[in-house]
A protein has these predicted regions:
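Boundary at the C-terminal end of the N-terminal hydrophobic targeting segment
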Residues: 21-25
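Glycine-rich, aromatic-bearing surface loops/beta-hairpins
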Residues: 152-163, 167-215
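Extracytoplasmic/secreted envelope proteins and their assembly/folding machinery
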Residues: 58, 62, 66-69, 170, ...
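Sec/Tat-exported extracytoplasmic proteins
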Residues: 68-76, 176-181
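Acidic/histidine-rich, surface-exposed loop or edge segments in extracytoplasmic proteins
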Residues: 36-53, 141-160
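Bacterial N-terminal signal peptides that target proteins for export
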Residues: 1-13
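Acidic helix-start/capping segments at beta-turn-to-alpha-helix junctions
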Residues: 77-102, 190-197
Length: 215
């Protein structure tokens, strides 16, 4: 009888577990990142790719960098121009790109002063042509918060980032291209083996400011 009673007790307890779990309050949703005032800051960055394993045509490198900029949330209208191209078509030994792109940056007093000073040089030309005041445009502020952008290679065969892009991503980090554009690399794991493609070679995370949509 004692053994039977213990079994019933265990069964009753197990049956109650789903009810107890359901009664537990749900974990609170994580707080959104703090909102800051931001401005668009345009920067120009030159980059030359030096391959050992994966080779790109000039168009291929340009398109890959364009995709990265879109992932980072660069302001529409950015440009990526090919540099140092010799081959009309096919892989290049050391293709390069010139990037002109704007990403949000926190609107500190120092940055606003710098942007206003740079834009003031264009004021006379803007007035003569009836264009908007460049100082007002350059210092226009908007709310933004930090967004984490993750890059992971080879998730599917159709992924934009493949394991063969390992050297490219590694060189972009090493050359501080992300930093020069106004992004922050917070996690960088690349396993690039010369003349060999490694599965799962790229796992990176980059933080950028993202405009907060108007309510």
């Amino acid at each position: 009888m004692r053994r039977s009673w213990q079994g019933g007790c265990v069964a009753t307890t197990l049956c109650m577990l789903p009810l107890l779990a359901a009664a537990q309050p749900e974990a609170p949703a994580p707080e959104p990142a703090a909102t800051v005032s931001a401005v668009w800051v345009e920067r120009k960055v030159n980059f030359t790719y030096m391959p050992l394993t994966s080779y790109y045509s000039c168009d291929g490198l340009r398109d890959k960098v364009r995709w990265i900029l879109r992932e980072l949330g660069a302001k529409p209208g950015f440009t990526v121009r090919s540099r140092g191209c010799i081959e009309v078509r096919g892989p290049e030994l050391s293709p390069g790109v010139e990037v002109v792109a704007a990403l949000p940056a926190e609107a500190t007093p120092e940055l606003l002063e710098q942007l206003a000073a740079d834009a003031s040089k264009q004021q006379l030309a803007a007035r003569a042509t009836g264009k908007p005041d460049p100082v007002i445009e350059a210092t226009a502020q908007f709310p933004a918060r930090v967004r984490r952008v993750e890059f992971e290679s080879g998730r599917t065969t159709l992924s934009d980032l493949q394991d063969g892009d390992c050297e490219l991503m590694e060189q972009l980090v090493r050359g501080d291209v992300f930093g020069k554009l106004g992004a922050k690399v917070v996690e960088s794991h690349t396993h690039c083996v010369p003349r060999q493609v490694t599965l799962g070679a790229v796992r990176m995370a980059v933080e950028v400011l993202k405009p907060v949509p108007a309510q």
